[in-house]
Design a protein with these regions (language model features):
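A structural detector for beta-sheet-dominated domains
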Residues: 14-16, 26, 35, 69, ...
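General beta-strand recognition
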Residues: 41-43, 75, 86
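Glycine-rich strand-loop-strand elements at beta-sheet edges
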Residues: 48-69
């Protein structure tokens, strides 16, 4: 069981055939919670990362937590269909 965390800033990123990146994470953000409406591939990185079809697989409707560094972003690309990636900063 996962311990409780404080939810911070949330944003949605469109999932499509081309990579799309989120806004930069806040200065106190070391973890993000993500959930997608359709299967996709994700990459977290500095600057503006570009998600590739060989990056980490995220199935639809399965919340996942990732460690990050303040100022990083998450990029997403569809597996087979478009959708929405919900990204929530966790404090």
């Amino acid at each position: 069981m996962r311990s409780a965390s404080r939810l911070g800033t949330a944003q949605d990123v469109a999932i499509g055939a081309a990579s799309a990146a989120s806004a930069a994470f806040g200065v106190q953000t070391y973890q993000v919670r993500v959930v997608a409406t359709s299967a996709c591939r994700v990459r977290i990185g500095d600057g503006t990362p570009i998600a590739l079809t060989t990056d980490s697989y995220l199935p639809a409707d399965c919340p996942e937590y990732f460690t990050c560094t303040p100022g990083q972003r998450i990029a997403v690309i569809q597996e087979s269909a478009g959708g929405k990636l919900s990204v929530t900063e966790v404090e």
